[in-house]
Amino acid sequence: ISIIKQNGFKQVNRIVNSTHILIKIPEPTQNQLNEFAGETKRIERSAISRIARIKSDAIQRIKAALEREYIEPHVAVPAKAHLENIQQSAVSEIRLIGLKKRKTLLGRFFSYTDEEEKKLGKKLEKSPHNNLFSS
């Protein structure tokens, strides 16, 4: 218990007749919440980047298949368009989920960073993602 208290946890109690310890964890500070929101934004950008790489790889495979005549152009063109639609849908979902997580983390301290995020916020209100991360 003393080691736990030395590491900054002030409310540490041993539960009577048990080997369990009850530790009261303090609420995060505003700076910590901002760091969490920043990390959420970073994860969001990383996921969008991975999706772009996946799409690029798939398009390269389609081009290679066209060059080797494994597939016909009338098949490749809709496939590329479908990939584009899938990417746009995935990016939209990632942004909605990221926005909801930041709103949940920051609570009343949340503010939109730009007009695009404001539009996304209006879309989020009508989205099933609005129920995510509710406490």
PLM features per residue range, with description:
Residues 1-33:
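Ribosome-associated translation termination/rescue signal centered on the conserved GGQ peptidyl-tRNA hydrolysis loop
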Residues 21-135:
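Positively charged, low-complexity, intrinsically disordered RNA-binding extensions
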